[in-house]
Amino acid sequence: MRHLRTSPPSRAASRLTVLTLLGTLTACSMLATSVAAVASPTAQGSQLTGVVLDNSTNAAGTSPSQTTGSNSSNGSSKGSGGSTGSPGSTGAKIPKGLESFYRQKLTWTDCPDGATGTAFQCATVTVPLDYDHPQGKTITVALKKLPSTSPSPRGSVFLNPGGPGGSGISLINIHAGLYKTGGLSGVLANYDVIGFDPRGIGQSTPITCWSPEDVQAIVDGRAQAPSQLTPGSAGDIVAKGSRDAATCQKYTEVPEILDHMDTRSVARDMDVMRALVGDQDLNFLGYSYGTYLGAVYTELFPDNVGRVVLDSAMDPTLSRQGSFEGDAAAEEQTLRTYIESQQGQAGFPLNGSTDEAVTRLATFLDGLDANPLTVSDGADSLNRAEATNAIKELVVASPDKWPLLNEGLTQAMNAHDGTALMKNAGFLPGEGGPTATEAQIVEHLQSVYGFAANRCLDFPDSGNQASWDAALASYRRDYPVFHSLVPQHNAYCHGWGHTGKTEPVDVDVDATNPVLVVGILHDPATPYPWSKALVSKLRNSHLLSVDMYGHGATGFNSCATAKVNDYFVKGALPSDGEVCAANPEPRAEEQAPAGVGTPAGVATLAGVARPVGSRAG
């Protein structure tokens, strides 16, 4: 991780703390608010109810920990196979030794959104900390349900926003309008829609890698949030990973969870949740890293797969570092497309051949650490990573943002002023919303460290200092503009220490039911070839291609949203080779209000612009 400066942070730097954090670490995390959705803030203090195991002991004879809740019930939810909603009666096999977890009684209580009045229900599920030793410690997973508009829904659809480290509870808060009145209203007419916080995240048993004083310093602008882009050698990165893990160990209430936040464990949690809502098969919508989670679930539980949509897919064959490198390559290619489309325009500062333009921009950015850009009244300044983040957010969003990037680059390169660049990216006060709150900063920090914990655990320790340093040098050559946003994660995980003991799950399976994969042709976070690679590994799957820029099509592209809705409602699959066109440009009177329809990959949160779908996974 990288602290961007050693001197006290400027106002621009403090605004960029969360931006840098997620821009450098969170590859595919939360998606943009959809065009059809009504954005709503995360409900604070939502009441989470507990579960009661229906056996006094688990299979090993040890009593799992329990929490209490109200006695309100889930109602008559049925699995996609028509089974009843009582725990353990879905017809799917219960893994040996986990009977008590699969048969616990799930209770729901009302937890309405205070801002919108949306009638959510909340619950918690108890799961083993370590599935290899289910008689040991337990943890909880938090769920939030948007109940179906049908009195007799056919089942539930679970959501994951990506990350890893993204909050499904935040996603259901934000996307409720998409299901209530938007393009996925057919889903809500047939299913309950459930967001959940994966283990270690949010309202589930969390990791905590910071003190209250650390958070307050970030809120006040006295400190920057951490970044995984540590300057210097691989040795410096290893040391940073070690310090971060020690901090997590110190402040996390259940520190053992740092060894059990892998994707395999999250997928097993989902199977417990599937059983507890009474579904024979898992119905699931996963974005970005959530596609990898869905693919791992399909590999582990091929007979329990219902209707599964994997949007903006990861390539399940990539290594830990390979996903970062694939992102950077896609971003560089999108930048080249941008440059080629703008050359010849009056005042454009990157004319000449494309290679010459890329070199000119890279050289300019490389000089910003020694001579930062000024911003606004001169009290702010921007170094290389900060300016590169702003460029990236504008270039990867969509071509309609490229004139704004032209304006920002022209001012930056001709007048050494970063004001237009930051303003057009939405990173200045008044452009990105009010000041970040403590709760929002904590959510970001959890997603960042949740990302580290998951990606480090999903792969064994890999490489050595010489190979890591060689990779860092190659990034500067191969990704001349965006190399400063590529972390050396293998080195970081070596220092972090909580790494995988086995190889990643080998996804190569025929699921019982067909899986729908949605791939975006111009996706800079999870490049389109990754979706094709996933389809090749999920042999009973179908690919829907979407001709748009951005990350995450469902809820943003009207054609893709309709196809996903039809798949969940009717089981309808796209024809071979089917491509959804980009949305038509709206007329001025049809433009969405502020905060709605934010370009995929960029969502403003509390004055700190946060690139939410930007790196590795």
For the regions a language model picked out, list residue spans one by one.
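C-terminal region of N-terminal signal peptides and the immediate post-cleavage residues
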Residues: 28-62, 80-89
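Compositionally biased, intrinsically disordered low-complexity segments enriched
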Residues: 6-10, 15, 29, 64-90, ...
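Secretory targeting and sorting signals
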Residues: 1-41, 125, 270
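Alpha/beta-hydrolase-fold enzymes
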Residues: 344-453
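Extracytoplasmic/periplasmic regions of membrane proteins
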Residues: 49-52, 62, 67, 105-110, ...
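Gly/Pro-rich cap/lid or specificity-loop segments adjacent to the active site
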Residues: 90-387, 453-617
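N-terminal non-cleavable signal-anchor helices
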Residues: 19, 39, 52-53, 423, ...
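Intrinsically disordered low-complexity regions specifically enriched for long asparagine
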Residues: 53-57, 66-71, 75-99, 124, ...
